[in-house]
Amino acid sequence: METATLVAIFISGLLVSFTGYALYTAFGQPSQQLRDPFEEHGD
C-alpha cells in the first residue's frame, strides 16, 4: 500500500478508538464514578 493510505487508515483508527473510549467513559462502567456538579449544587 502507499504511505498516504496507511497514514489515513492509522489516523482514522486512532479517531475511532478515541471516540469509542470517550463514549465508554461517558456512558459505560466508569461513568458511575463521575461527579455531577449540578447534583452537588442543589439550590
Curated annotation (Swiss-Prot):
Source organism per UniProt: Nicotiana tabacum
Annotated protein name in UniProt: Photosystem biogenesis factor 1
Membrane topology value: Single-pass membrane protein
Annotated knockout phenotype: When grown photoautotrophically on soil is highly light-sensitive with extremely slow growth and pigment deficiency; on sucrose-containing medium under low-light grows like wild-type. Strongly impaired photosynthesis; both PSI and PSII levels are decreased.
Keyword Transmembrane helix: yes
Pfam family for this entry, one: PsbN
Family membership noted in the UniProt record: Belongs to the PsbN family.
InterPro entries membership: PSII_PsbN
A Gene Ontology BP annotation from the UniProt entry: photosynthesis
Organism lineage: Eukaryota, Viridiplantae, Streptophyta, Embryophyta, Tracheophyta
Gene this protein is translated from: pbf1
The protein's role, per its UniProt record: May play a role in photosystem I and II biogenesis.
Compartments in which it is found: Plastid, Chloroplast thylakoid membrane
Domain of life where this protein originates: Eukaryota
Keywords: Chloroplast, Membrane, Plastid, Thylakoid, Transmembrane, Transmembrane helix
Residue spans crossing the bilayer: 7-27
HAMAP family per UniProt: PSII_PsbN (MF_00293)
Cellular component GO terms, alphabetical: chloroplast thylakoid membrane
Induction data: Expressed in leaves; transcribed from the opposite strand from the psbB-psbT-psbH-petB-petD operon, it is found in the antisense region between psbT and psbH.
